């Protein structure tokens, strides 16, 4: 039985690590009426909340819903294999609409994007640090000299916030631990499960999904530490998108939690709702990034 579990876990690990491989990126387009010459296609870029395949499974229904309910428009989901690829496209204004993390959201303002909304549930936008229950790790200082896995350097909740927590609790992140950036949330978690790292940084949503879908893996792990929260992932739009389209997208997103179809989509995202936001919503993120840059490592 143990050997079967290891084989299944290793298969899951390979799938989770797929964002770093040179594979075609998932970018399915959905339209309820087919491709018409009069329809305008809008590219919706969602940052690597999950690996591309998982992201496709979670967000494709939302693209189909928007396409079905906005006349003359179709929405194309674009996933990126990793944070670096997503950042490059976001800052080059490839996306018409985007769902970046708060760090990327703040940066996107300087690239011409406008914040119009965000994910709700700010209490869930926090970093968590997982360890194996049999690791023997008791305190932050036990991480000295150990490997800690993260999704990517620019992941706010899953990397920067845990690193700030470690730094402010007595361990120098840049000199006293071995930081490994492994490409995705799932990969970070699997690294600690497979003992490739002593601790794994992520955030609650991937951990909740794993605990539900793979309890055989989750039962070996525990959340040892968690950070304070910050505002959740933002919704931004490029300035050349017609205001009428932005208004309709906003209306549809902000009312998802009121209908059964919307609740089902939000459930896949482990989210209760989308809500309105603007630049002022993310002032606390800007302040955190300033502290992080001074106390942990410089941000590009």
Segments (PLM) and residue ranges:
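Sec-dependent signal peptide recognition
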Residues: 2-8
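An extracytoplasmic/periplasmic, membrane-proximal ligand-sensing/linker region
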Residues: 18-45, 50-57, 61, 230-232, ...
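C-terminal motif of bacterial Sec signal peptides marking the signal peptidase cleavage site
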Residues: 13-16
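Extracytoplasmic small-molecule ligand-binding "clamshell" domains
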Residues: 26-102
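Pocket-lining segment of extracytoplasmic ligand-binding domains
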Residues: 135, 146-244
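Short helices/loops that flank or line small-molecule/ion binding pockets
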Residues: 84-98, 111, 141, 185-205
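Acidic, polar ligand-binding/catalytic clefts
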Residues: 87-142
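Hinge/capping helix and adjacent helix->loop/strand transition within the periplasmic-binding protein
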Residues: 131-146, 240, 247, 255
């Amino acid at each position: 039985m143990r050997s079967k579990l290891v084989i299944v876990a290793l298969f899951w690990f390979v799938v989770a690590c797929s964002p770093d491989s040179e594979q075609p990126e998932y970018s399915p387009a959905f339209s309820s009426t087919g491709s018409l010459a009069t329809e305008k296609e809008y590219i919706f870029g969602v940052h690597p909340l999950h690996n591309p395949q998982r992201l496709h499974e979670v967000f494709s229904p939302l693209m189909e819903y928007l396409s079905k309910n906005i006349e003359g428009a179709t929405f194309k989901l674009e996933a990126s294999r990793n944070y670096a690829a997503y950042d490059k496209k976001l800052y080059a204004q490839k996306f018409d609409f985007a769902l970046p993390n708060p760090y990327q959201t703040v940066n996107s303002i300087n690239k011409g994007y406008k914040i119009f909304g965000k994910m709700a549930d700010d209490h869930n936008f926090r970093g968590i640090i997982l360890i194996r229950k049999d690791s023997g790790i008791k305190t932050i200082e036990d991480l000295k000299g150990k490997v800690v896995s993260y999704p990517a350097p620019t992941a706010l909740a899953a990397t920067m916030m845990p690193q700030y927590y470690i730094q402010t609790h007595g361990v120098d992140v840049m000199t006293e631990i071995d930081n490994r950036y492994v490409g995705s949330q799932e990969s970070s978690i699997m690294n600690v499960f497979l003992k490739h790292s002593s601790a794994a940084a992520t955030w609650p949503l991937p951990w909740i999904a794993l605990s539900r879908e793979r309890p055989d893996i989750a039962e070996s792990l525990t959340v040892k530490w968690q950070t304070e929260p910050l505002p959740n992932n933002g919704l931004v739009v490029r300035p050349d998108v017609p205001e009428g389209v932005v208004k309709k997208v906003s209306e549809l997103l902000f009312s998802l939690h009121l209908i059964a179809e919307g609740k089902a989509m939000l459930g896949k995202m482990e989210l209760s709702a989308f809500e309105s936001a603007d630049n002022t919503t993310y002032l606390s993120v800007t302040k955190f990034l300033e502290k992080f840059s001074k106390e942990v490592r410089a941000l590009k």
